[in-house]
Amino acid sequence: MALPNQQTVDYPSFKLVIVGDGGTGKTTFVKRHLTGEFEKKYEPTIGVEVHPLDFFTNCGKIRFYCWDTAGQEKFGGLRDGYYIHGQCAIIMFDVTARLTYKNVPTWHRDLCRVCENIPIVLCGNKVDVKNRQVKAKQVTFHRKKNLQYYEISAKSNYNFEKPFLYLARKLAGDQNLHFVETPALAPPEVHIDIADQQKNEAELLQAAAQPLPDDDDDIFE
């Protein structure tokens, strides 16, 4: 159910649901946006925190009401009330934990069962960590389902804005939309090796040109 205070702003606002296994960094990611963290509200009936994240675009201000599960996914699936009226979504996994990627199809299925035809971004978090278990070339689910994929590092703010910009463009139907101002973000807690990450991004591009494997299970053999 949409929050009573959700449509009080006089500029476009959207419900953004963030899903993925516990411990993948969803809460850390949302809390990087300082204004949203300051203005968050708890919705006890569903057990979620809702963070209002504002972004400034060349077409004006927009707001994402980011629904964060507050860790309840660790105790079973999420209730439909979490997904209902969702207008866009982020599915997050942890590149240092293989199982969190293997569970992405389940999250995608649960999401699409309630929210049909909404823009979805897949995010591989924690790319700042050295012992990566899910290599860039092994991430293929987004290609099978026509999702956008970004490698991110919540703790270093790496690529923080990209999922939001992609979703904003999709929701506005305007590929030329861009952010004109950086939101206030928490200072980086870690630093990412940009040279290393550029190699990963290059690997992603190369993988995109290859035929898809028949089954995701094959990629971890």
From Swiss-Prot:
Cellular location(s): Nucleus
Keywords: GTP-binding, Nucleotide-binding, Nucleus, Protein transport, Transport
Binding of GTP, residues: 21-28, 71, 125-128, 153-155
Residue stretches making up the Small GTPase Ran-type domain: 10-174
Signal peptide as annotated in the record: none
GO molecular function annotations of the record: GTP binding; GTPase activity; mRNA binding
Record-level GO cellular component terms: apoplast; cytosol; Golgi apparatus; nucleus; plant-type cell wall; plasma membrane; plastid
Segments for region (Switch-II): 71-87
Nucleotide-binding recorded as keyword: yes
Primary subcellular site in the record, as a coarse category: nucleus
Disulfide bonds: none
SMART domains: RAB, RAN, RAS, RHO
Region listing for Switch-I, in residue ranges: 40-48
GO process terms (BP): defense response to bacterium; defense response to fungus; protein import into nucleus
Stored PROSITE patterns: RAN (PS51418)
Entry's induction text: Regulated by light.
Function summary: GTP-binding protein involved in nucleocytoplasmic transport. Required for the import of protein into the nucleus and also for RNA export. Involved in chromatin condensation and control of cell cycle.
Subunit structure: Found in a nuclear export complex with RanGTP, exportin and pre-miRNA. Interacts with RANBP1A and RANBP1B. Interacts with TRN1. Interacts with ATX1. Interacts with KPNB1. Binds to XPO1. Interacts with MOS14. Binds to NTF2B.
Family: Belongs to the small GTPase superfamily. Ran family.
Annotated protein name in UniProt: GTP-binding nuclear protein Ran-1
Organism, scientific name: Arabidopsis thaliana
Encoding gene, per UniProt annotation: RAN1
